[in-house]
Amino acid sequence: MDYNVSAGSETYRGFLMDNILHSDVGDIHFHLYIPESYDKSEPYALYLSLPGYEGLYFQGVGTNIRSEDFAFEAQKYNDKMIIAAPQLSDWGNTSAEQTIALTEYLLDAYAIDRGKVYINGYSGGGETLSLVLTKRPELFTAALHVASVWDGELAPLVQARTPVYFVIGESDEYYGSARISRTYEELCRLYRAEGLTEEEIGALAVLDVKDRAWFGGGNQHGGIGRVSQDETVMRWLFGR
């Protein structure tokens, strides 16, 4: 398939900035990190990081990776991984379709190990992630859903068996933790209805509600971003 891509001209901490995939669902702005060792002779892992509101494109080029560390911390877990940090335009269906289009482009354009395709979404990016995993859960090996809620459906996720790690502060100032806790409980119920054991469910769905002490008394919705430095969480994602 032919793709129309405008390459960026500036770099930031190893990322080629503001590439544009001109797609049927609009122009998709994204920053791209390709390890120097990549030469197409060996399939690499792929990771996409969906930003919160502060990282959307209208906030300015690069605000996503200047305010969130997921794309940089990920490099510590696999030195053979291509990383894309899209700057989306909203946290709804448009951004979900654009995330899927970008993923499909990257899978076609680069030598990617289809068994190592990861994604995370923080805040509004988590809402987008829930829609992505409703539409095309089979594209991804595992997902990290950070400080957000689930706007999508769960049945497609159950059918695809895509593992999801939900993490949020117990008193998240924007979303609270009750809604995503209910989502997790419903997801587990659906897996039980499919006949899965508790051990099997535990490998597919994790709920990690951080207490006040974890934040040191500070802001929880913004402070949750430091899970990008939490080895337990990140190894769960990239160990799949």
Mark where each language-model region is.
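Active-site machinery of serine-nucleophile hydrolases
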Residues: Y44-I100
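Short, solvent-exposed loop/turn and secondary-structure capping segments
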Residues: E42-P43, Y57-T63, A96-E97, L131-V132, ...
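A domain-start/cap signature at the N-terminus of enzymes
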Residues: M1-L46, E127, L131-V132, Y191-A205, ...
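Primarily recognizes the serine-hydrolase "nucleophile elbow" in alpha/beta-hydrolase
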Residues: D108-A109, G115-Q159
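Short, proline-enriched alpha-helix->beta-strand connector loops that line the catalytic pocket
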Residues: D79, V158-V164
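Gly/Ser-rich "nucleophile elbow"/oxyanion-hole loop immediately N-terminal to the catalytic nucleophile
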Residues: S37-E42, W91-S123
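C-terminal catalytic histidine-bearing segment of alpha/beta-hydrolase fold enzymes
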Residues: Y165-V167, E173-Y175, S181, L190-R240
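Solvent-exposed loop/turn segments at secondary-structure junctions
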Residues: G52-L56, L88-N93, S123-E127, S148-G152, ...
